[in-house]
């Protein structure tokens, strides 16, 4: 038996399987057979193939039959779903759904070849198809519509690690985070016709639907527990801050929760018209506070569609020289900014060393620049609200907790479109409220 390996040439790749079988993948524009297969796949997906499968799994679950699916293959699919966290796993689940759809619609199409084009400037396999186009137009929109996966609207195939110019196999070397080995095993099983693709697709969709139902029940329970907590407690700034801090520090991916907590407080302030002439910008996706997205910070207030106030959350980071220089570059293209700042989870280090540069930036751009801890920032916002006399401390503290909980419960997607999976965060918050 050979060891599975990939041979790469200037115009082709050759995947050598353990039994000596060689699969040839010629590079170049899509051939006529690939175009015909691709058209068939597009027609099926554009006329609702995936949506029909989702609705069948949701509305006729008693008619589902998974007897043809082995325990080993069920395990692979279960592990894919279980691997999804707020940081990893979503792209591989989305890709698995896409590959199963493709194979169910057109069994002759290889699901290893994820790029296909007629344009000579683009990399393409002659037998490949554009999985990125299929994802963006047909897969991600359906998964988002039925809340099966929290995905960016651009689609999971925009993930760089899925776009290498090599066929998908166990020797695909990109750094894919999540249940990589399970996904690889699934690809091999599909290509060997060891699974019936439509049955596997329905099983995977059923597991995602179960998870979605569980989330909705947990969201309702957490909101009910918060209501009971607020009725039984005379709430103030300290109590709400303590509860939210405890939740952040006991949860995974605390940096993202700190952003959500800050944005939630601003939501509460907006509800009480603390800044009546400004508009809170909807929460951005994780890691999007950069020049490419036109952001200055994680939290932004707009006036006449221009950013006038921005705060950037820095969890676990206390020395901010690089961040200050990045802010200076961003301010050059955002002349309307009047206040900007960094909010740290730790006390800022070597602040005396940074102050001259901060003062210089204030002078150049005519802004107020602040570096404060999360606790100090919360105090500033409460003081700001009380000075406006639009809400009492108790009202704002309660509204903050409500906004934070409802944001995580996916009840505020217009202002807080959180695409991170929130189940574990919500579970921990529910536990925290129950203890309180």
Describe the role of every protein-language-model region.
Residues 3, 7-8, 249, 260-436:
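Catalytic core segments in nucleotide and nucleic-acid processing enzymes
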Residues 88-92, 213-220, 274, 416, ...:
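Residue-level signal for secondary-structure boundary elements
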Residues 32-41, 60, 141-150, 195-211, ...:
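Charged, low-complexity, helix/coiled-coil-prone segments
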Residues 154, 162-287:
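The feature marks a conserved, polyanion-engaging helical scaffold used by nucleic-acid processing enzymes
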Residues 1-191:
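Terminal, charged accessory segments of proteins
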Residues 74-81, 140, 180, 184-191, ...:
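Generic detector of well-ordered alpha-helical segments enriched in charged/polar residues
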